């Protein structure tokens, strides 16, 4: 199949390999981006690429807590300048408080909620857009519930560019916040290895088995080396197996155990993750404005 320049660019952006290497991998993978990434990794030419590495939209994330419910939201704007102003921040908190109180099923349902007489949440967002001169959108949210014996931990990093919300059982709010801080900083994908889907593990195993540095090694040696690499891979993506950000001498599992608690669930949002950023040529923009 024909490989486009856009496909080559996307693969290069995700793996930092040369143009010809990217094109060859895409040809071999019949244009499948994820398969091409795996092929490059097998050749030792690219580091593991995470989906959604390219961050695009501006905006902020925020966590609102009300009793046994909490909501984490992402509100997007076109520029970080608007994301930092008072009108946007007021809207951010208003949206989060509405979502945590009403617990809508999805974004569409949230936008239809009546927040004031005759005014929906969408109307409120549009009103702020008119004030700021930029398009503002509610991209996503999650509403999380806990029991009376559990605690929420919430943490926002870099002025709201990243937020994390965690539920712990048995441990204090302070311990929960420390774990939320870890989640914001280290970005685990799952609580424990038991949550990692089998296909994710099988894919990683296939990549490692095909690695060129294992070629020619006896099967029993190869199997042991791959087993070790899978263990390392799981430790990198699962919260409980990661070195605790506040004390690298212990894992998160060891920390929460020392607090007589356990981690039930978590949500982590980073502004714009998974959305490709529009790159603007400043000189071209100025030229257009000058006519």
From Swiss-Prot:
UniProt entry keywords in alphabetical sequence: Cytoplasm, Elongation factor, Protein biosynthesis
An example Gene Ontology CC term for this record: cytoplasm
CDD domains cross-referenced by the UniProt entry: UBA_EF-Ts
Domain of life: Bacteria
GO molecular function, one term: translation elongation factor activity
Region of interest: Involved in Mg(2+) ion dislocation from EF-Tu: 79-82
Compartments reported by the entry: Cytoplasm
Pfam families attached to this UniProt entry: EF_TS (PF00889)
Xref: NCBIfam families: tsf
Family classification: Belongs to the EF-Ts family.
Purpose: Associates with the EF-Tu.GDP complex and induces the exchange of GDP to GTP. It remains bound to the aminoacyl-tRNA.EF-Tu.GTP complex up to the GTP hydrolysis stage on the ribosome.
Protein's recorded name: Elongation factor Ts
The species this protein was found in: Leuconostoc citreum (strain KM20)
């Amino acid at each position: 199949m024909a490989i486009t320049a856009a496909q080559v660019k996307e693969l290069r952006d995700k793996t930092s390999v040369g143009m010809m290497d990217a094109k060859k991998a895409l040809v071999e993978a019949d244009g499948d981006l994820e398969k091409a990434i795996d092929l490059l990794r097998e050749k030792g030419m690219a580091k593991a690429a995470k989906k959604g590495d390219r961050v695009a939209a501006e905006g902020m994330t925020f966590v609102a807590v009300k009793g046994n419910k909490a909501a984490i939201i992402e509100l997007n704007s076109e520029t970080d300048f608007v994301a930092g102003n008072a009108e946007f921040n007021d809207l951010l908190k208003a949206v989060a408080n509405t979502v945590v109180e009403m617990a809508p099923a999805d974004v569409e349902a949230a936008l239809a909620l009546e927040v004031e007489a005759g005014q929906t949440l969408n109307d409120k967002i549009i009103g702020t857009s008119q004030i700021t001169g930029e398009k503002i959108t509610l991209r996503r949210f999650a509403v999380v519930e806990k029991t009376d014996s559990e605690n929420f931990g919430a943490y926002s990093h870099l002025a709201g560019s990243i937020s994390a919300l965690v539920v712990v059982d048995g441990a204090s709010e302070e311990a929960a916040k420390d774990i939320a801080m870890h989640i914001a900083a280290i970005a685990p994908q799952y609580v424990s290895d038991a949550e990692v889907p089998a296909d994710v593990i099988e894919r990683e195993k296939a990549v490692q088995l095909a690695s060129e540095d294992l070629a020619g090694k006896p099967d029993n040696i190869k199997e042991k080396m791959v087993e070790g690499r899978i263990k390392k891979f799981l430790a990198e993506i699962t919260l409980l197996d990661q070195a605790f950000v506040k004390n690298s001498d212990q894992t998160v599992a060891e920390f929460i155990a020392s607090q007589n608690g356990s981690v039930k669930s978590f949500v982590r949002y980073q502004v714009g993750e998974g959305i490709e950023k529009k790159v603007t040529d400043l000189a071209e923009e100025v030229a257009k404005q000058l006519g």
